[in-house]
């Protein structure tokens, strides 16, 4: 189990990657307590003084001008949670819910939400007990925050809704009992504070970021293997080429290929005097394409790290000034655009991989046996595996369409522009799965090509990468049932086994 002390506003991407991967034991920095208490006191003072403040003693959305009587304030907070729990579809994975809850705890604990520490402590206890609310994946437009997903999370605090514990769906009441909790009666503003925020969108986008980083590392390894298998040149990775263009990420991408390929190898020396002048773009322009993808990954990482530590509630309590101010931090446009950029990177990583794989099976370009198998005609080799890769690459082109440019008014036109950040982040999982499948096919093909170059060998790192695959998948001496081999290669990549072959500091959370 991963242990994490939350210092509000200070979560790192590396910590969040661990939260997304492992059950987590949370604790909260005790220095956060005073700010939370003061913030909650400001809300209590509003009630005591009889002021009218949105979200505390008013309705919500288009009903914001409706004043709520003091006797109904507890009912108001309970009602907003139950009425907004209107999601649909399959439940989020436990890992996504855990990440979302950690983000919510981090935001609330900063002391701008007017919520009592006991509510935050209850969320922490649920995470520590590995009790995860059942949250439908669909139903949020990413403004006013992720209302439906966060409402489903919050129903469990009331002893309502459903949760999952050790793979079993249980009632909210049972979930609280397992976590050693009793149902909470929410104080004024607490229901709205729980529901307003970008944490579902950000959790999906962070998962997409972590997947994109893993894919980037895998694709760089596969690309370097393909260079060797196709008797490609190392010259396109010369640092001087990339230095004069000036893009930092392109320079770093080229460095990663040099790191893998080393100065030379038996295979490299075997074609020193060949007649080929230039390699096809899918080999030669890898630093340029992958460098651009790396830049999008890094840009998105910066945005998502800020958002992960942000306060996206509304209204916000500024206790030092005694002010409660309504704004729009719940609007997840930054998250949506970051996710859209990740979608571009994930799609292009897969698209370039498919082209390299297509090159390998083309004997005219690669100087390898047609479709990477002997006795062609009797054997079809990798012929249809490339078709599968092409299908996945084309599917990703559709999924990469920007979600952030879409908007549909909600709440009787009070919420008349929305971000669609939740979908923007959620579809990244499907895209990553597609790209991983493409890379799995290339990995199989590149390893096959390298074996055809025997007895010549590649660099130590490339040989190690091939060895990891060969522990699970044998060389193709003739046609056999292909799908299980793709599945094994896919599983290897899903384990992110090639991340450690990357230079340090290349990828933000690794």
From Swiss-Prot:
A Pfam family recorded for this sequence: Lyase_aromatic
GO biological process: L-histidine catabolic process to glutamate and formamide; L-histidine catabolic process to glutamate and formate
Keyword match rRNA-binding: no
Keyword ATP-binding assigned: no
Alphabetical keyword list: Cytoplasm, Histidine metabolism, Lyase
EC number(s) on file: 4.3.1.3
Top-level lineage group: Bacteria
Sequence positions bearing 2,3-didehydroalanine (Ser): 144
GO cellular component: cytoplasm
Catalytic reaction(s) noted: L-histidine = trans-urocanate + NH4(+)
Metabolic or biological pathway, per its Swiss-Prot or TrEMBL entry: Amino-acid degradation; L-histidine degradation into L-glutamate; N-formimidoyl-L-glutamate from L-histidine: step 1/3
EC class name: lyase
Annotated crosslink 5-imidazolinone (Ala-Gly) location: 143-145
Cellular localization per UniProt: Cytoplasm
MF (Gene Ontology): histidine ammonia-lyase activity
CDD domains cross-referenced by the UniProt entry: PAL-HAL
Post-translational modification: Contains an active site 4-methylidene-imidazol-5-one (MIO), which is formed autocatalytically by cyclization and dehydration of residues Ala-Ser-Gly.
Family listed: Belongs to the PAL/histidase family.
Listed name of the protein: Histidine ammonia-lyase
Species in which this protein is naturally found: Aliivibrio fischeri (strain ATCC 700601 / ES114) (Vibrio fischeri)
Gene: hutH
